[in-house]
Protein backbone atom coordinates (compact mmCIF):
# COMPACT_ATOMS: atom_id res chain seq x y z
CA UNK A 1 0.00 0.00 0.00
CA UNK A 2 1.10 3.57 -0.66
CA UNK A 3 -0.37 6.74 0.75
CA UNK A 4 -1.94 9.53 -1.27
CA UNK A 5 -0.75 12.16 1.21
CA UNK A 6 1.57 12.08 4.21
CA UNK A 7 1.72 14.86 6.80
CA UNK A 8 5.09 14.96 8.57
CA UNK A 9 5.96 16.74 11.79
CA UNK A 10 2.37 17.45 12.71
CA UNK A 11 0.96 18.40 16.08
CA UNK A 12 -2.42 16.72 15.91
CA UNK A 13 -5.35 17.91 18.01
CA UNK A 14 -7.05 14.63 18.91
CA UNK A 15 -9.86 13.89 21.37
CA UNK A 16 -7.18 12.79 23.86
CA UNK A 17 -5.14 15.98 23.50
CA UNK A 18 -2.21 17.27 21.45
CA UNK A 19 -0.03 14.61 19.86
CA UNK A 20 3.08 14.95 17.72
CA UNK A 21 2.69 12.34 14.98
CA UNK A 22 2.55 11.66 11.25
CA UNK A 23 -0.76 11.36 9.43
CA UNK A 24 -1.28 9.18 6.34
CA UNK A 25 -4.22 9.48 3.95
CA UNK A 26 -5.61 7.04 1.38
CA UNK A 27 -8.77 7.55 -0.66
CA UNK A 28 -9.88 10.58 1.32
CA UNK A 29 -9.68 8.85 4.69
CA UNK A 30 -7.10 8.70 7.46
CA UNK A 31 -5.26 5.40 6.99
CA UNK A 32 -2.35 5.77 9.43
CA UNK A 33 -1.70 7.85 12.51
CA UNK A 34 1.50 7.05 14.34
CA UNK A 35 4.69 8.62 15.61
CA UNK A 36 6.61 7.98 12.39
CA UNK A 37 5.07 6.57 9.22
CA UNK A 38 7.35 4.55 6.92
CA UNK A 39 4.78 3.86 4.20
CA UNK A 40 5.67 5.53 0.87
CA UNK A 41 3.45 8.41 -0.23
CA UNK A 42 2.62 10.08 -3.53
CA UNK A 43 2.88 13.45 -1.78
CA UNK A 44 4.56 14.41 1.49
CA UNK A 45 3.75 17.66 3.26
CA UNK A 46 6.00 19.00 6.01
CA UNK A 47 3.70 20.74 8.48
CA UNK A 48 6.28 21.37 11.20
CA UNK A 49 5.24 24.32 13.32
CA UNK A 50 1.55 23.92 12.53
CA UNK A 51 -1.29 22.36 14.49
CA UNK A 52 -3.64 20.02 12.66
CA UNK A 53 -7.22 20.50 13.83
CA UNK A 54 -10.14 18.33 12.76
CA UNK A 55 -12.16 20.26 10.21
CA UNK A 56 -14.81 22.46 11.81
CA UNK A 57 -18.36 21.12 11.48
CA UNK A 58 -20.48 24.27 11.77
CA UNK A 59 -23.90 23.10 12.92
CA UNK A 60 -25.70 26.43 12.38
CA UNK A 61 -25.43 28.25 9.04
CA UNK A 62 -27.88 30.20 6.84
CA UNK A 63 -26.78 30.23 3.19
CA UNK A 64 -30.22 31.19 1.81
CA UNK A 65 -29.99 29.42 -1.55
CA UNK A 66 -32.24 29.09 -3.52
CA UNK A 67 -34.27 32.27 -3.65
CA UNK A 68 -32.09 34.61 -1.60
CA UNK A 69 -28.62 33.98 -2.98
CA UNK A 70 -28.17 37.77 -3.03
CA UNK A 71 -28.11 37.50 0.79
CA UNK A 72 -25.62 34.62 0.77
CA UNK A 73 -25.22 31.48 -1.32
CA UNK A 74 -23.26 28.26 -1.40
CA UNK A 75 -20.34 29.70 -3.37
CA UNK A 76 -19.39 32.66 -1.19
CA UNK A 77 -20.67 31.18 2.05
CA UNK A 78 -18.59 28.03 1.77
CA UNK A 79 -15.51 30.03 0.81
CA UNK A 80 -15.85 31.90 4.10
CA UNK A 81 -16.38 28.66 5.99
CA UNK A 82 -13.37 26.97 4.37
CA UNK A 83 -11.15 29.98 5.09
CA UNK A 84 -12.12 29.58 8.73
CA UNK A 85 -11.14 25.91 8.86
CA UNK A 86 -14.57 24.37 8.23
CA UNK A 87 -14.96 21.21 6.17
CA UNK A 88 -18.67 20.59 6.83
CA UNK A 89 -21.72 22.62 7.79
CA UNK A 90 -25.40 22.14 8.53
CA UNK A 91 -27.62 24.59 6.66
CA UNK A 92 -30.80 25.91 8.23
CA UNK A 93 -34.16 25.57 6.42
CA UNK A 94 -34.55 29.34 6.23
CA UNK A 95 -33.77 31.89 4.80
CA UNK A 96 -33.87 30.16 1.43
CA UNK A 97 -37.07 30.92 -0.44
CA UNK A 98 -39.11 28.85 -0.30
CA UNK A 99 -37.84 27.32 2.95
CA UNK A 100 -37.10 23.61 3.34
CA UNK A 101 -40.53 22.44 4.51
CA UNK A 102 -41.08 19.61 1.98
CA UNK A 103 -39.20 16.83 0.20
CA UNK A 104 -39.20 18.86 -3.02
CA UNK A 105 -37.54 21.84 -1.33
CA UNK A 106 -34.98 19.54 0.31
CA UNK A 107 -34.08 17.97 -3.02
CA UNK A 108 -33.77 21.37 -4.72
CA UNK A 109 -31.39 22.67 -2.08
CA UNK A 110 -29.38 19.43 -1.97
CA UNK A 111 -28.86 19.59 -5.74
CA UNK A 112 -27.65 23.18 -5.57
CA UNK A 113 -25.32 22.36 -2.70
CA UNK A 114 -23.73 19.46 -4.55
CA UNK A 115 -23.20 21.73 -7.56
CA UNK A 116 -21.74 24.70 -5.70
CA UNK A 117 -20.49 23.90 -2.19
CA UNK A 118 -16.75 23.72 -1.59
CA UNK A 119 -17.28 21.57 1.49
CA UNK A 120 -19.64 18.88 2.75
CA UNK A 121 -23.06 19.87 4.05
CA UNK A 122 -26.20 18.60 5.72
CA UNK A 123 -29.64 20.19 5.54
CA UNK A 124 -32.01 20.99 8.36
CA UNK A 125 -35.73 20.66 7.67
CA UNK A 126 -38.27 23.10 9.03
CA UNK A 127 -40.80 22.38 11.78
CA UNK A 128 -43.71 24.84 11.50
CA UNK A 129 -47.52 24.77 11.72
CA UNK A 130 -47.51 24.63 7.90
CA UNK A 131 -45.75 21.29 7.43
CA UNK A 132 -46.50 18.81 10.21
CA UNK A 133 -47.80 16.45 7.53
CA UNK A 134 -44.45 16.68 5.67
CA UNK A 135 -42.12 15.68 8.50
CA UNK A 136 -42.11 11.95 7.72
CA UNK A 137 -41.08 12.72 4.13
CA UNK A 138 -38.34 15.08 5.28
CA UNK A 139 -36.99 12.45 7.64
CA UNK A 140 -36.97 9.82 4.92
CA UNK A 141 -35.08 11.99 2.44
CA UNK A 142 -32.29 12.71 4.90
CA UNK A 143 -32.65 15.94 6.84
CA UNK A 144 -30.04 16.30 9.56
CA UNK A 145 -32.76 17.35 12.00
CA UNK A 146 -35.81 19.60 12.38
CA UNK A 147 -35.62 23.31 13.24
CA UNK A 148 -38.40 25.22 15.01
CA UNK A 149 -38.73 28.83 16.10
CA UNK A 150 -40.50 29.47 19.38
CA UNK A 151 -40.73 33.17 18.49
CA UNK A 152 -41.18 35.02 15.19
CA UNK A 153 -38.47 34.03 12.72
CA UNK A 154 -38.46 37.36 10.90
CA UNK A 155 -40.05 35.70 7.86
CA UNK A 156 -43.78 35.03 7.59
CA UNK A 157 -43.10 32.04 5.30
CA UNK A 158 -41.48 30.28 8.29
CA UNK A 159 -43.95 30.84 11.15
CA UNK A 160 -43.20 30.13 14.77
CA UNK A 161 -44.16 26.72 16.13
CA UNK A 162 -46.96 26.95 18.67
CA UNK A 163 -46.76 24.59 21.63
CA UNK A 164 -48.78 21.79 20.04
CA UNK A 165 -46.82 22.01 16.78
CA UNK A 166 -43.54 21.76 18.65
CA UNK A 167 -44.79 18.89 20.78
CA UNK A 168 -46.13 16.90 17.81
CA UNK A 169 -42.97 17.64 15.84
CA UNK A 170 -40.88 16.25 18.68
CA UNK A 171 -42.97 13.07 18.70
CA UNK A 172 -42.34 12.62 14.98
CA UNK A 173 -38.63 13.37 15.37
CA UNK A 174 -38.37 10.80 18.15
CA UNK A 175 -39.92 8.17 15.90
CA UNK A 176 -37.28 8.84 13.22
CA UNK A 177 -34.30 9.31 15.56
CA UNK A 178 -33.86 12.96 14.60
CA UNK A 179 -32.83 15.98 16.65
CA UNK A 180 -35.17 18.96 17.07
CA UNK A 181 -33.39 22.31 17.23
CA UNK A 182 -35.22 25.22 18.82
CA UNK A 183 -34.78 28.97 18.71
CA UNK A 184 -35.80 29.43 22.32
CA UNK A 185 -37.32 32.83 23.01
CA UNK A 186 -40.86 33.36 24.28
CA UNK A 187 -43.04 34.52 21.39
CA UNK A 188 -45.65 36.21 23.57
CA UNK A 189 -43.09 37.85 25.83
CA UNK A 190 -40.89 39.27 23.05
CA UNK A 191 -43.89 40.37 20.96
CA UNK A 192 -45.51 42.29 23.80
CA UNK A 193 -42.28 43.95 24.89
CA UNK A 194 -41.55 44.99 21.31
CA UNK A 195 -45.06 46.37 20.81
CA UNK A 196 -44.83 48.36 24.04
CA UNK A 197 -41.44 49.84 23.15
CA UNK A 198 -42.54 50.85 19.67
CA UNK A 199 -45.81 52.33 20.95
CA UNK A 200 -43.68 54.57 23.17
CA UNK A 201 -41.66 55.70 20.15
CA UNK A 202 -38.55 53.78 21.15
CA UNK A 203 -36.32 52.65 18.28
CA UNK A 204 -32.71 52.61 19.49
CA UNK A 205 -30.17 49.87 20.07
CA UNK A 206 -30.67 49.73 23.83
CA UNK A 207 -34.45 49.68 23.35
CA UNK A 208 -34.10 46.58 21.19
CA UNK A 209 -31.75 44.85 23.62
CA UNK A 210 -34.16 45.46 26.49
CA UNK A 211 -37.10 44.06 24.51
CA UNK A 212 -35.56 40.56 24.60
CA UNK A 213 -34.29 40.05 28.17
CA UNK A 214 -32.76 36.82 29.44
CA UNK A 215 -36.05 35.77 31.05
CA UNK A 216 -37.64 35.39 27.59
CA UNK A 217 -34.94 32.82 26.78
CA UNK A 218 -35.33 31.03 30.11
CA UNK A 219 -39.10 30.66 29.70
CA UNK A 220 -38.76 29.11 26.24
CA UNK A 221 -35.89 26.82 27.26
CA UNK A 222 -37.99 25.52 30.15
CA UNK A 223 -40.90 24.72 27.82
CA UNK A 224 -38.68 23.03 25.25
CA UNK A 225 -37.13 20.89 27.98
CA UNK A 226 -40.56 19.90 29.26
CA UNK A 227 -41.70 18.79 25.80
CA UNK A 228 -38.45 16.91 25.18
CA UNK A 229 -38.77 15.13 28.51
CA UNK A 230 -42.36 14.10 27.82
CA UNK A 231 -41.79 12.95 24.22
CA UNK A 232 -38.29 11.51 24.68
CA UNK A 233 -37.11 13.58 21.71
CA UNK A 234 -33.53 14.71 21.23
CA UNK A 235 -33.41 18.48 21.75
CA UNK A 236 -30.72 20.87 20.53
CA UNK A 237 -30.96 24.39 21.96
CA UNK A 238 -29.38 26.74 19.43
CA UNK A 239 -27.63 30.07 20.01
CA UNK A 240 -28.07 30.06 23.78
CA UNK A 241 -27.02 33.54 24.89
CA UNK A 242 -26.92 33.42 28.69
CA UNK A 243 -25.24 31.38 31.37
CA UNK A 244 -28.57 31.09 33.18
CA UNK A 245 -30.16 29.36 30.18
CA UNK A 246 -27.19 27.00 29.87
CA UNK A 247 -27.45 26.14 33.56
CA UNK A 248 -31.17 25.45 33.22
CA UNK A 249 -30.62 23.16 30.23
CA UNK A 250 -27.67 21.41 31.86
CA UNK A 251 -29.82 20.71 34.91
CA UNK A 252 -32.32 19.06 32.57
CA UNK A 253 -29.54 16.98 31.04
CA UNK A 254 -28.51 15.80 34.50
CA UNK A 255 -32.09 14.65 35.04
CA UNK A 256 -31.96 12.51 31.90
CA UNK A 257 -33.40 14.80 29.23
CA UNK A 258 -31.70 14.25 25.87
CA UNK A 259 -30.55 17.84 25.31
CA UNK A 260 -27.47 19.47 23.83
CA UNK A 261 -26.58 23.14 24.08
CA UNK A 262 -25.13 25.38 21.37
CA UNK A 263 -23.82 28.88 21.75
CA UNK A 264 -22.25 31.13 19.12
CA UNK A 265 -18.95 32.97 18.79
CA UNK A 266 -20.62 36.39 18.85
CA UNK A 267 -22.04 35.77 22.33
CA UNK A 268 -18.54 34.86 23.51
CA UNK A 269 -16.65 37.68 21.76
CA UNK A 270 -19.00 40.70 21.72
CA UNK A 271 -21.39 42.25 24.26
CA UNK A 272 -24.39 44.54 24.22
CA UNK A 273 -21.99 47.44 24.67
CA UNK A 274 -20.43 46.51 21.32
CA UNK A 275 -23.86 46.59 19.66
CA UNK A 276 -24.28 50.18 20.83
CA UNK A 277 -20.88 51.01 19.34
CA UNK A 278 -21.00 48.96 16.11
CA UNK A 279 -24.70 48.96 15.31
CA UNK A 280 -26.53 46.85 12.75
CA UNK A 281 -23.72 44.38 12.04
CA UNK A 282 -24.23 43.00 15.56
CA UNK A 283 -28.01 42.80 15.64
CA UNK A 284 -29.25 39.27 16.34
CA UNK A 285 -31.84 37.39 18.36
CA UNK A 286 -31.41 36.53 21.14
CA UNK A 287 -29.43 39.76 21.40
CA UNK A 288 -25.91 40.16 22.65
CA UNK A 289 -25.84 40.48 26.43
CA UNK A 290 -24.12 42.74 28.92
CA UNK A 291 -20.55 41.83 30.02
CA UNK A 292 -21.63 40.19 33.29
CA UNK A 293 -23.99 37.86 31.43
CA UNK A 294 -21.25 37.04 28.93
CA UNK A 295 -18.90 36.06 31.75
CA UNK A 296 -21.58 33.72 33.12
CA UNK A 297 -21.78 32.13 29.66
CA UNK A 298 -18.01 31.65 29.61
CA UNK A 299 -18.12 30.06 33.07
CA UNK A 300 -20.66 27.54 31.83
CA UNK A 301 -18.53 26.77 28.77
CA UNK A 302 -15.36 26.34 30.81
CA UNK A 303 -17.27 24.02 33.15
CA UNK A 304 -18.07 21.73 30.20
CA UNK A 305 -21.80 22.50 30.12
CA UNK A 306 -21.94 23.66 26.47
CA UNK A 307 -21.80 21.07 23.70
CA UNK A 308 -21.29 22.95 20.44
CA UNK A 309 -20.34 26.37 19.10
CA UNK A 310 -21.93 27.25 15.75
CA UNK A 311 -21.54 30.47 13.80
CA UNK A 312 -25.24 31.18 13.11
CA UNK A 313 -23.94 32.91 9.98
CA UNK A 314 -26.93 34.93 8.73
CA UNK A 315 -26.00 37.87 6.50
CA UNK A 316 -28.28 40.17 4.54
CA UNK A 317 -27.82 42.93 1.93
CA UNK A 318 -26.81 46.38 3.22
CA UNK A 319 -30.24 47.91 2.63
CA UNK A 320 -31.69 45.46 5.17
CA UNK A 321 -29.12 46.58 7.75
CA UNK A 322 -29.63 50.33 7.27
CA UNK A 323 -32.30 52.21 9.21
CA UNK A 324 -32.71 54.66 12.06
CA UNK A 325 -35.19 52.17 13.55
CA UNK A 326 -33.10 49.38 15.06
CA UNK A 327 -36.16 47.15 15.49
CA UNK A 328 -36.74 47.07 11.71
CA UNK A 329 -33.21 45.96 10.79
CA UNK A 330 -32.53 42.37 9.76
CA UNK A 331 -31.26 40.40 12.72
CA UNK A 332 -28.32 38.27 11.68
CA UNK A 333 -24.53 38.30 12.02
CA UNK A 334 -21.91 37.36 9.42
CA UNK A 335 -19.58 34.96 11.17
CA UNK A 336 -18.89 31.89 9.02
CA UNK A 337 -15.17 32.61 8.83
CA UNK A 338 -14.49 33.41 12.46
CA UNK A 339 -15.68 30.63 14.79
CA UNK A 340 -12.31 28.91 15.18
CA UNK A 341 -10.58 32.30 15.43
CA UNK A 342 -12.79 33.34 18.34
CA UNK A 343 -12.31 30.07 20.19
CA UNK A 344 -8.53 30.19 19.79
CA UNK A 345 -8.29 33.85 20.84
CA UNK A 346 -10.97 34.18 23.53
CA UNK A 347 -10.88 30.56 24.67
CA UNK A 348 -7.33 29.22 24.29
CA UNK A 349 -5.19 32.38 24.42
CA UNK A 350 -7.19 34.37 26.97
CA UNK A 351 -8.74 31.67 29.17
CA UNK A 352 -6.56 28.59 28.75
CA UNK A 353 -9.26 26.45 27.14
CA UNK A 354 -7.53 23.22 25.99
CA UNK A 355 -7.29 22.71 22.25
CA UNK A 356 -8.98 19.32 22.42
CA UNK A 357 -12.02 20.96 24.05
CA UNK A 358 -12.17 23.51 21.23
CA UNK A 359 -11.95 20.66 18.72
CA UNK A 360 -14.78 18.86 20.52
CA UNK A 361 -17.03 21.93 20.58
CA UNK A 362 -16.46 22.69 16.89
CA UNK A 363 -16.10 19.23 15.38
CA UNK A 364 -16.43 16.05 17.45
CA UNK A 365 -19.55 16.94 19.43
CA UNK A 366 -21.67 18.10 16.47
CA UNK A 367 -20.55 15.06 14.46
CA UNK A 368 -21.67 12.75 17.25
CA UNK A 369 -24.91 14.61 17.94
CA UNK A 370 -26.03 14.59 14.32
CA UNK A 371 -25.05 11.05 13.42
CA UNK A 372 -21.98 11.76 11.27
CA UNK A 373 -19.37 9.24 12.44
CA UNK A 374 -16.94 9.94 9.57
CA UNK A 375 -16.57 13.54 10.68
CA UNK A 376 -15.23 15.45 13.63
CA UNK A 377 -12.00 13.73 14.65
CA UNK A 378 -8.49 12.84 13.58
CA UNK A 379 -8.57 9.05 13.78
CA UNK A 380 -7.92 6.08 11.51
CA UNK A 381 -10.99 5.45 9.36
CA UNK A 382 -12.38 8.98 9.62
CA UNK A 383 -12.60 11.35 6.67
CA UNK A 384 -9.35 13.25 6.20
CA UNK A 385 -10.90 16.63 7.00
CA UNK A 386 -8.54 19.03 8.74
CA UNK A 387 -7.26 22.58 9.08
CA UNK A 388 -3.60 23.59 9.33
CA UNK A 389 -3.30 26.33 11.95
CA UNK A 390 -0.35 28.49 12.99
CA UNK A 391 -1.32 28.59 16.63
CA UNK A 392 1.07 31.34 17.72
CA UNK A 393 0.50 33.64 14.77
CA UNK A 394 -1.25 36.89 15.66
CA UNK A 395 -3.14 38.74 12.95
CA UNK A 396 -5.88 41.25 12.24
CA UNK A 397 -8.78 39.89 10.20
CA UNK A 398 -9.03 42.10 7.13
CA UNK A 399 -9.85 39.69 4.29
CA UNK A 400 -13.37 38.27 4.32
CA UNK A 401 -15.00 35.96 1.81
CA UNK A 402 -18.72 36.08 2.62
CA UNK A 403 -20.97 37.97 0.20
CA UNK A 404 -21.46 41.15 2.20
CA UNK A 405 -18.69 42.97 4.01
CA UNK A 406 -20.81 44.33 6.87
CA UNK A 407 -19.00 41.95 9.18
CA UNK A 408 -18.33 42.73 12.86
CA UNK A 409 -15.18 40.60 12.91
CA UNK A 410 -13.38 42.82 10.38
CA UNK A 411 -10.49 44.53 12.14
CA UNK A 412 -10.57 42.19 15.15
CA UNK A 413 -7.24 40.81 16.38
CA UNK A 414 -6.85 37.07 16.79
CA UNK A 415 -4.22 34.48 17.65
CA UNK A 416 -4.13 31.34 15.49
CA UNK A 417 -4.33 31.76 11.71
CA UNK A 418 -5.78 29.07 9.43
CA UNK A 419 -3.21 28.44 6.67
CA UNK A 420 -5.04 25.66 4.84
CA UNK A 421 -8.18 23.54 4.94
CA UNK A 422 -8.40 20.01 3.52
CA UNK A 423 -11.57 18.08 2.67
CA UNK A 424 -11.11 14.31 2.36
CA UNK A 425 -7.39 14.79 1.86
CA UNK A 426 -7.69 17.48 -0.84
CA UNK A 427 -6.99 21.18 -0.27
CA UNK A 428 -9.96 23.51 -0.62
CA UNK A 429 -8.27 26.60 0.86
CA UNK A 430 -4.58 27.54 1.02
CA UNK A 431 -3.28 30.90 2.22
CA UNK A 432 -5.97 33.06 0.66
CA UNK A 433 -6.61 30.89 -2.40
CA UNK A 434 -9.44 28.45 -3.07
CA UNK A 435 -8.33 25.36 -4.92
CA UNK A 436 -10.14 23.01 -7.25
CA UNK A 437 -13.82 22.80 -8.07
CA UNK A 438 -16.73 22.48 -5.62
CA UNK A 439 -16.59 19.00 -4.15
CA UNK A 440 -19.08 19.16 -1.28
CA UNK A 441 -21.25 16.11 -0.66
CA UNK A 442 -24.63 15.89 1.04
CA UNK A 443 -24.40 14.46 4.55
CA UNK A 444 -27.26 12.35 5.90
CA UNK A 445 -27.42 11.28 9.54
CA UNK A 446 -27.08 7.77 10.82
CA UNK A 447 -29.72 6.78 13.35
CA UNK A 448 -29.04 8.24 16.78
UniProtKB/Swiss-Prot annotation:
Molecular function GO terms recorded: allantoinase activity; cobalt ion binding; zinc ion binding
GO cellular component: cytoplasm
Pfam families per UniProt: Amidohydro_1
Enzyme class: hydrolase
Assigned EC number: 3.5.2.5
Associated pathway: Nitrogen metabolism; (S)-allantoin degradation; allantoate from (S)-allantoin: step 1/1
Keywords linked to the UniProt accession: Hydrolase, Metal-binding, Purine metabolism, Zinc
Binding locations of Zn(2+) 1: 60, 62, 147, 312
PANTHER family: ALLANTOINASE (PTHR43668:SF4)
Function: Catalyzes the conversion of allantoin (5-ureidohydantoin) to allantoic acid by hydrolytic cleavage of the five-member hydantoin ring.
Similarity comment: family membership: Belongs to the metallo-dependent hydrolases superfamily. Allantoinase family.
Protein name in the entry: Allantoinase
Amino acid sequence: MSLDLLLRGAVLVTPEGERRADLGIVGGQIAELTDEIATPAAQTLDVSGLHVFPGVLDDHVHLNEPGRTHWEGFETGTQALAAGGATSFLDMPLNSSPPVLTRERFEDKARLGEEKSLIDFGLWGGLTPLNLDQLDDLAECGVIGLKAFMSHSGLDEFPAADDLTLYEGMRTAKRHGLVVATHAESNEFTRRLTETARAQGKSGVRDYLESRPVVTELEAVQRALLFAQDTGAALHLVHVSSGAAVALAYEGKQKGIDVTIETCPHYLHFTGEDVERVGAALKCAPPLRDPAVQEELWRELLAGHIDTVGSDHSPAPPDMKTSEDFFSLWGGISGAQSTLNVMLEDGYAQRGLPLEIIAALLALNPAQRFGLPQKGRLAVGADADFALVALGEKFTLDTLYDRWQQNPYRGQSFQGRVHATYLRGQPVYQNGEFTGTPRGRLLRPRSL
